[in-house]
Structure formats: C-alpha cells, structure tokens
Amino acid sequence: MGMTMAYGAADEAGGIATIKRAHDLGVTLLDTAELYGNGTGSNEKLVGEAVAGFRDDMVLATKFGFVLPRGSDPNRQLDSRPDRIREVAENSLRYLGTDHIDVLYQHRVDPDVPIEDVAGAVKELIDAGKVRYFGLSEAGPDDIRRAYAVQPVSVLQTEYSIFERAVEKEILPTTRELGIGFVAYSPLGRGFLTSQVKPASEYGPDDMRSFDERWQPGNYEQNVAAIERLTELAQQKGTSVTQLALAWLLAQGDDIVPIPGTRSPDRLAENVGAADVTLTADDLKLVDEILPGGSFGSRYAEANMPSWERG
C-alpha cells in the first residue's frame, strides 16, 4: 500500500526495485488492492511490472470492496455487489498482468450485501480459474463463519501487532477452529515499531500518521516510552525493535504471516532478518508487561473502525 498511497509521495522505480529485492531475499507473498491505486490501478500495475520475470514464484493477493472517490469527493464507500466483484477481479488481472489471482480478499465487510453473496461471487471466480483462494479482511467471527459455509475462507487479514491485539479475543480462536490462515497487516504499527517516529504534526497531510490517534499528543508520548523499553529488550537480544516486533508475531503461531510494508531495500532486509530472531518465554512475558493492552490510542477513528471491533 505504502508504495503508492498513505505515506507521502510515491516512487515507482524505487518500489519496483524493492519488490525485486524482496524476491531475491526469498519473500513470496505480495499484498496489493484496488484501493491502493485510488481507481488508477497504479499499485497493482507496479506489482505486476515488478514480478513480471518471476510471477510463478510469488503469491499475489489483492482486494475488492470499495467505491473509489471521484473528482473532488474524498469519501470512500463500500461496494461488494457480485457484479462489482467481477469487475474488480477483471481489472486486477489486467493490472497485475496475470491469468489468475492467488488470493482475492473482500477488503471490508459490506453491510448492504449478504456475505453469502460475496462468497458466492468469489466461488464463481475460483471455479472459473481466475482466483485460487478466498480471503476476508477485518471480518468478525459471524461473517467468517457465514462466508465459510458458502466458500471456504483460506485466509483472514486483520491488523495485529504488539500495538494491536484485539484479534486475540475472538478472531484468532475462530480462524484456528476453521483452519484459516492469518495475515497480520501493519505488524510494525504503521511504522511506530521501527523507532523511527515523530509527532503527528511533523507529518504531511497526505500521510495517514498525521491523523492517527496513536501519534497525537498524550498518546504519542506514552507510546514512545513503551518503544524505548522494547528497544532495551531488543538491544539485549542483539537485534532491532523492528525485528523484535516481527519475531513477536511469528512467535504467536505458525498460522500467523506478517506483511510489513516498506519502500526501503535496507528496511526490507532488516524485516526479513526477523525470521532468525528467537524470543524466549521470558521475552514474551516482558513484552506483555510493557504493553499489556496494546498501544495508547485507537488504530482508527470510530467511524472507520471495523464493525466487529465496534461491537
């Protein structure tokens, strides 16, 4: 996502180089979405161009589910009607330059379209050979079960990190019961868990951290204090706080796959190195003591919070 939106100006050439470097380092899963190109397909096109020489080595995941803003309208609305799903899938196939999508996610649950209809539309695409696996993003336990009854859900993608642990209560028990893999997005707390952070006021208006509650005065200082303690633990382990955060996720179970985003080849190599970091039971206990309930400040404004988390 961050290669074309949400974190300031994009650098297409740099993005392609980073993806190619990821392949060299053994990364096999790339995550994109219709939304990340704001209707232009730019993110999917970037991914498609980058992997053209090694497409068969990669698992390409993309998403449908939004009506994208037009003209001066900044608002995004949900749209998971079956006709729209088919339209987005065809666009994604073209943008990615591939004959199949490995994982097709519903980006957000659409309250106006029964989840059974969504699952049925994706099932048709799977039966046609255009999609291989069905995924959901930020879906609650009930929606997961209802969708699964129509078309088995292979993977759920939801925010999960040392900072955000709400999924541990009901979501992970549900996916584990059904044998669904879990992809953790924002595993580095949108960059907070890299220790390279600054207050919200120092980010530009096109950077989502400028309005993220965790960067706002009061919350920011408490989160920085927690990062300082995590950094001390990382130093004791001979690693970085970034690798510590990713290793923590990997330690939560073999079903957890974090997808850290980066534009930097150096950061990419650091992220991959987290697979070599082993955390002890005492290390995990200390992390729980430092941030027992996750970060200070909500991950989204109330209006944008997924329905399962709003209650």
Regions found by a protein language model. Name each.
Residues T4-A6, V67-P74, R267-E270:
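A short acidic, helix-capping loop that chelates divalent metal ions and anchors anionic groups
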Residues Y7-G14, S42, L46, R76-R84, ...:
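Alpha-helix N-cap and loop-to-helix initiation/capping positions
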Residues G15, L30, V47, L60, ...:
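Conserved, mostly hydrophobic/aromatic
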Residues K20, R70-A166, E170, G181:
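Glycine/proline-rich, positively charged
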Residues V167-P205, S240:
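Aromatic-lined glycan-binding groove of carbohydrate-active enzymes
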Residues P205-Q236, A251, D255-I256, P265, ...:
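Terminal-tail/helix-coil boundary detector
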